[in-house]
Structure formats: structure tokens, C-alpha cells
């Protein structure tokens, strides 16, 4: 059994980790931790629906974690995880970090977009970007996983085969993404349903969203050249689910059916990626509460643009589910275990 701990359980991703790991056949949850002693209480007092788990939330204690955990999931806010990670790694504990603190390979880029000084720069080089389907071999050997963001997961998985096959123009990629309100965190979701619901709106327009450098970084790695995108996120009046529509200029005319075959070949054997048939319409309801990413595409022959639609559950494949998938890879378990 893999002994697991979770640091930070009061947010959506922490709760989702509990849901998945509590049913995982190869996992024993050995520790739950808050950021301070003020969070010490029994799990059932926070989440009554987990009353089958006789666990207490303890104050963060690295020495204790090192003794009872093989791996720790960090469901902490940005700019908090990098205060914790060095102590855990130095104590020999594997870490899967769900924040953005170790996703960007250049610390100056992180500092510019997150407006905070990175205090654990030397650990950035030790991290592996945890997009499970693209970095499997590196994840197997990793001590520190930087779990991808939800928007980047939909976009990068949606674009990767086209980028690697080289039949698209990397200039002028336009991405229009919609997220359920849980993507902005529990506090924001509560405020939304109190003050705005029902509503549908764009936010962080004109290149302001923090996931932009993450998407550009990984697409640039795939292509071998710098990629710049135009990205506009939106909030939907549903709790969970994420849909990204991606518009890319083609270098030459290729039939939709041929592109679908390229995608299926690229993702051959990857259980959680589904490439749909031509003319199949995607919706978020198809992936809710699952770790699947479903992708459909069609060439607009009039404009010679490739239109890609990529959907996930932002709390599962976009966060906690992919984190567990990465844990499975790290410990030599079937990727589908617990998922």
C-alpha cells in the first residue's frame, strides 16, 4: 500500500483528493494536515460525508510526515507550497504539488505573473511537469511533480498532436475556455452563487490569466520554438466542468478524418484520452466526475482553420484526478487505479 498524506483539505481539490484516495485499492491515507495548529480537528467535523474515515487533521509536521507517508499531495494556495516543498523533499518524501509554484521552469516568469518572489528556486529544476500522458517516463523517476493547471490540461492535450505533427501554424493560436465556478476556488464559488448566479462572463481578458505562460511554455517544448497564444477564460454557472475551444490556422489543407487518425495514433494506449469521431458534439456532462479528457475536432474548410474542442472535469483530470494518476505512475501502479 502507498502511504499518502494530504496537506490542505478545506478547498475543492483537497476534498476531491480525499474522495478519490479513500476508494483507491492501493492507498492508505496516513496523514491529513492543515497549514497551522488552528486547523486541528476531526475530518468528520469538516466533511460529515467522510465519516467512514477515522482521521484527524493535524498541524503540518515534516518529521511526522517523513515517518508515515511515502507521498504527499499539496493542495495549498500559490506562494505557499514553495515554503513547504524543500522540507519535504529533503526529508525523502515524494511530493505532488497542485499549486503553480513549480510549473514554470523560469523563476522570473513565475515572479512576474504571480507577483511574488520564489524562495525555492533551486527545487524548480527537480520538478517534473505532471501532464501524465506527455511526461510519463519522467514522472516515473520524479521526486517532485508540478501538477498542471486545469485550463492548461485541456489546451495542451488538445493541441499536442497537432503541434508535434507540424501541420499547423504556431502563430495566432486562439483559445476560448469555459470553466465551472469551482475552478476559481471555494471562496470565489460561494461568492458567485450568492451574488451573481446565474451568470456567464469572461474574465482576465487580453492576456492577463496566469495560466498563459504555462500553456506557452509546454507548447514551446513540444514544438521546439516559441509559441504565443491568445487566451480568454470564462466562468459558467455550473459547479464543475471545463471546455476549451481552440482555433489554429493550418499550413496546408488536410481532411478532418486524417487529423483524427493522427490524434488517435498520438494517444494510442492512453486510457484517459478519448478522440471522438468526426461531427460528434462534445459537452462537459460527458466527462463530469471522471478523469477523462475528450477531444473532438473539425477543419473549417472555408477559413482553413482547425477547430479543436477539449473537455475535462476541472476538479478531476484538471486537478486531483491527474494528481492521483501521477502518483500511480510514480509507484508503478496501473494508471487507472482508483480512477
Swiss-Prot record:
GO terms for biological process: L-arginine biosynthetic process. Its EC number is 1.2.1.38. It comes from Endomicrobium trichonymphae. The keyword Transport does not apply. It is found in: Cytoplasm. The lineage of its organism: Bacteria, Pseudomonadati, Elusimicrobiota, Endomicrobiia, Endomicrobiales. One of its GO terms (cellular component) is cytoplasm. InterPro entries: AGPR_AS, AGPR_type-1, NAD(P)-bd_dom_sf, NAGSA_dehydrogenase, Semialdehyde_DH_NAD-bd. Catalyzes the NADPH-dependent reduction of N-acetyl-5-glutamyl phosphate to yield N-acetyl-L-glutamate 5-semialdehyde. PANTHER family: N-ACETYL-GAMMA-GLUTAMYL-PHOSPHATE REDUCTASE, CHLOROPLASTIC-RELATED, N-ACETYL-GAMMA-GLUTAMYL-PHOSPHATE REDUCTASE, CHLOROPLASTIC-RELATED-RELATED. Pfam families: Semialdhyde_dh, Semialdhyde_dhC_1. NCBIfam families: argC. The gene is argC. Its main location: cytoplasm. Belongs to the NAGSA dehydrogenase family. Type 1 subfamily. This is N-acetyl-gamma-glutamyl-phosphate reductase. One of its GO terms (molecular function) is N-acetyl-gamma-glutamyl-phosphate reductase activity. It catalyses: N-acetyl-L-glutamate 5-semialdehyde + phosphate + NADP(+) = N-acetyl-L-glutamyl 5-phosphate + NADPH + H(+). The active site is at residue 150.
Amino acid at each position: 500500500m502507498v502511504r499518502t498524506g494530504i496537506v490542505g483539505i478545506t478547498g475543492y481539490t483537497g476534498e476531491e483528493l480525499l474522495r478519490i484516495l479513500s476508494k483507491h485499492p492501493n492507498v492508505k491515507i496516513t496523514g491529513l494536515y492543515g497549514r497551522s495548529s488552528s486547523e486541528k480537528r476531526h475530518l468528520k467535523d469538516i466533511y460529515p460525508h467522510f465519516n467512514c474515515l477515522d482521521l484527524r487533521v493535524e498541524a503540518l509536521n515534516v518529521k511526522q510526515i517523513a515517518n508515515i507517508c511515502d507521498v504527499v499531495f499539496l493542495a495549498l494556495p500559490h506562494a505557499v507550497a514553495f515554503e513547504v516543498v524543500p522540507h519535504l523533499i529533503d526529508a525523502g518524501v515524494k511530493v505532488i504539488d497542485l499549486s503553480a509554484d513549480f510549473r514554470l521552469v523560469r523563476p522570473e516568469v513565475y515572479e512576474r505573473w504571480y507577483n511574488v518572489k520564489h524562495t525555492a528556486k533551486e527545487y524548480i529544476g527537480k520538478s517534473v511537469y505532471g501532464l501524465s500522458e506527455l511526461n510519463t517516463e519522467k514522472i516515473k523517476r520524479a521526486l517532485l511533480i508540478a501538477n498542471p493547471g486545469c485550463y492548461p490540461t485541456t489546451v495542451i492535450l488538445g493541441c499536442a498532436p497537432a503541434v508535434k505533427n507540424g501541420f499547423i501554424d504556431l502563430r495566432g493560436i486562439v483559445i476560448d475556455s469555459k470553466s465551472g465556478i469551482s475552478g476559481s476556488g471555494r471562496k470565489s464559488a460561494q461568492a458567485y452563487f450568492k451574488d451573481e448566479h446565474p451568470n456567464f462572463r469572461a474574465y482576465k481578458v487580453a492576456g492577463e490569466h496566469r495560466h498563459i505562460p504555462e500553456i506557452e511554455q509546454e507548447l514551446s517544448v513540444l514544438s521546439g520554438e516559441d509559441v504565443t497564444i491568445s487566451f480568454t477564460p470564462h466562468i459558467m454557472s455550473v459547479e464543475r466542468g471545463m471546455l476549451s475551444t481552440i482555433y489554429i490556422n493550418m499550413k496546408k489543407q488536410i481532411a478532418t478524418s486524417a487529423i483524427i487518425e493522427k490524434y488517435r495514433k498520438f494517444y494510442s494506449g492512453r486510457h484517459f484520452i478519448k478522440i471522438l469521431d468526426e461531427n460528434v458534439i462534445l459537452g462537459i456532462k460527458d466527462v463530469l466526475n471522471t478523469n477523462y479528457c475528450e477531444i473532438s475536432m473539425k477543419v473549417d474548410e472555408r477559413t482553413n482553420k482547425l477547430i479543436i474542442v477539449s473537455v475535462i472535469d476541472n476538479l478531476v483530470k484538471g486537478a486531483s484526478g491527474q494528481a492521483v494518476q501521477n502518483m500511480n505512475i510514480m509507484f508503478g501502479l496501473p494508471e487507472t487505479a482508483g480512477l
